[in-house]
Regions:
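Conserved nucleotide-binding/hydrolysis modules and their immediate coupling elements
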Residues: 207-312, 322-324, 420, 488, ...
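Short glycine/threonine-rich beta-strand-turn micro-motifs
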Residues: 167, 353-368
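Long insertion/accessory domains within large nucleic-acid-processing enzymes
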Residues: 260, 265-268, 401, 447, ...
Length: 606
């Protein structure tokens, strides 16, 4: 049976192509907000980090009514680091709206999310967004998107997909660029016409595959999934079949049931085939679990999630300043928080190590792990992390394989030489180079994942902030040999204390400082970057010796350059293999793993 009064769609796109803004506009024009209601920009991005970075990390569910048809919309992350989210939520929908920037065209992560949709044989609608941009080239972008579909072996149904031209910012969609540009009606009607209605059998035993987990401090864990067969109702007795151990079956009762309307979850008594529902009251529900009838407990196969490619060690902070700024500082606190993250993030892996105070955390990329670190920091955790390392595989002959990436770089023509030189040093191979479009050339590289660790900051410096770097995981390939990372050494504090202008003034002649006057430092803490290859120890807490013949005002004449304040991402990129990042709610500090200078030298030459 088909539910003709329901359509389930996911909005997929490369990061920053405007899909969250498009969903905002669909919500506004469907009439879910009151006329006098103030609506924030990118209302679907609810997490603080999402708003600050302008990216979507967690998939979001919403529902709108259009001409008596309920359209359930899922806004998905555009960054491949959060691809585990995309892969799961696509199981809930029958079609996707692929949003493509009218200037940039299809990008690496467009390819990533589209490939996942095609593997599931979903219907596709292409929305060419930002057609109001002066440099927009919609006709060429249509051709590029069709080429991408052919490259990904799309079927006839998907190659025959409709194209809608839109400006989410201006609030219009049209099927013809020369036609009327009034509202989003053409997009709504295309969705209803081209996306198939969800199908299922209401007479069969209940099946709901949990695709996402939400958490609410009042009701606890909330499982979100689509009703594939049967009917779900409040107070119904069900069986939860565990995703990883199908023999493990737990009897539960549905206490609360919700559907999505606009930005809200609305309580309902029951839900039919094809509905996307949120279920609360089941304490240890996990992603991939199936909720079934007591009589016919049959699990739905769970989508295999791509494996992690990089790892970091998360450990207890043991620096001299440990425990002064964090609320949660013990090994048990860190362990509980990391294992709790596994409940909602299927792409993450956490392993206990031989050292009780350290945990190996593996994820899909530096951004994936940096978002976890930032969330923990904001929640009051204090801990330390190591430099990111890639996860190697070995083939049947014992040959070492490493994760590879496709890097697509848009850069002003004058910087192409510097980019090619740097990426070649990092074992990158130039696959394709497209002539400048609007002054920008496009370079495509195949490069080991470890070749990109720590490169983004260097890239922004080399391109004076004008370059755009996008990457996509491209499987495993033969190990490419050693890569030399940072060429500059570290400036290391020699003793504990507070930094003083006089000490910093002498230190800044040796390199770039990361600290200003009046900051707490300790021996072994990295306080800057040298201009040379070796590390330099320096006393930044040293004050000027007092004499009877001091020139008036000579101390005031000491001019300090402003310190370079590193963001979390920059600090993660900067640290070397013998360094750690100390994370607290108030500060991010870089330090040597071995703080004692004598022991550090001994370890280096042993």
């Amino acid at each position: 049976m088909k539910r003709e009064d329901v359509r389930n769609i996911a909005i997929i796109a490369h990061v920053d192509h405007g899909k969250t803004t498009l969903v905002d506009e669909m919500l506004k024009q469907s009439g879910i907000f009151r006329d006098n209601q103030e609506v924030a920009e990118r209302v679907m991005d609810s997490n603080d980090i999402e708003k600050e970075r302008g990216i979507t990390i967690l998939s979001k569910n919403t529902g709108v009514m259009y001409n008596g048809i309920k359209i359930n919309i899922i806004d998905t992350p555009g960054h491949a680091d959060f691809g585990g989210e995309v892969e799961r939520v696509l199981k809930m929908v029958n079609g996707v709206v692929l949003v493509v920037d009218a200037f940039e065209g299809p990008m690496p992560q467009t390819k990533f999310v589209l490939k996942k949709a095609l593997e599931l044989d979903l219907s596709v609608i292409v929305c060419v967004n930002k057609v109001d941009r002066p440099e927009a080239r919609p006709d060429e972008v249509v051709d590029e998107t069709l080429e991408l579909l052919m490259e990904l072996d799309a079927g006839d149904k998907q190659l025959d997909c409709p194209f809608v031209f839109a400006s989410a910012k201006e609030g219009f969609a049209t099927l013809d660029l020369d036609g009327e540009k009034k509202d989003m009606k053409p997009l709504f009607e295309t969705i209803i016409e081209h996306i198939e209605a969800p199908e299922g059998d209401p007479e069969k035993p209940l099946q709901v595959l949990i695709s996402t987990i939400d958490y609410n401090e009042y009701v606890g864990r909330i499982g979100i999934g689509k009703v594939d067969n049967g009917e779900i109702a409040v107070n119904k007795e069900c069986i939860v079949v565990n995703a990883h151990d199908p023999e493990r079956k737990e009897k539960v009762r549905i206490t609360k049931l919700y559907e999505f309307e606009g930005l809200d979850k609305v309580e309902v008594k029951n839900a039919q085939v094809g509905s996307i529902v949120a279920i609360s009251g089941i304490s240890d529900l996990s992603i991939g679990d199936t909720i079934c009838d007591v009589d016919g407990a049959e699990a739905i196969p769970f989508q295999k999630i791509s494996e992690p490619t990089i790892s970091m060690q998360f450990m207890v902070n043991d620096s001299p300043l440990a425990g002064q700024e964090g609320k949660y500082v013990t090994s048990r606190h860190i362990r509980d928080r990391l294992f709790r993250e596994l409940n909602t993030d299927v792409s993450l892996r956490v392993e206990e190590s031989e050292n009780q105070d350290s945990y190996k955390v593996s994820g899909r990329g530096e951004l994936h792990l940096s978002v976890l670190i930032e969330n923990m920091r904001r929640e009051g955790y204090e801990f330390a992390v190591s430099k990111a390392e890639v996860l190697y595989h070995y083939d049947e002959n014992g040959k070492k394989l490493e994760p590879m990436e496709i890097a697509v770089i848009d850069v002003p023509e004058e910087f192409t030489g510097a980019v090619i030189e740097k990426l070649s040093q990092r074992k990158g191979e130039l696959q394709n180079m497209t002539a400048a479009n609007g002054g920008y050339a496009r370079l495509e590289f195949s490069i080991p994942s470890r070749g990109l660790i720590g490169y983004r900051g260097e890239f922004m410096t080399d391109t004076k902030g004008n370059g755009i770097l996008n990457t996509l995981f491209d499987g495993y390939g033969p190990y490419k040999g050693d890569i030399q990372y940072r060429k500059q050494g570290s400036l290391i504090a020699y003793e504990a204390g507070e930094t003083i202008t006089y000490g910093l003034f002498n230190a800044q002649e040796r390199g770039t400082l990361f600290v200003g006057p009046g900051e707490k430092v300790y021996g072994g803490m990295v306080i800057g970057q040298t201009g040379k290859t070796e590390d330099i120890e320096i006393n930044v807490c040293r004050s000027k010796k007092l004499t009877n013949t001091r020139a008036s005002g000579s101390d005031d004449a000491l001019k300090l350059s402003p310190p370079k304040i590193l963001s979390l991402e920059q600090a993660l990129e900067f640290i070397d293999t013998d360094e750690l990042l100390e994370i607290t709610p108030e500060n991010i500090r870089i330090r040597k793993k071995i703080l004692d200078p004598t022991m550090r030298k001994r370890a280096k030459f042993s």
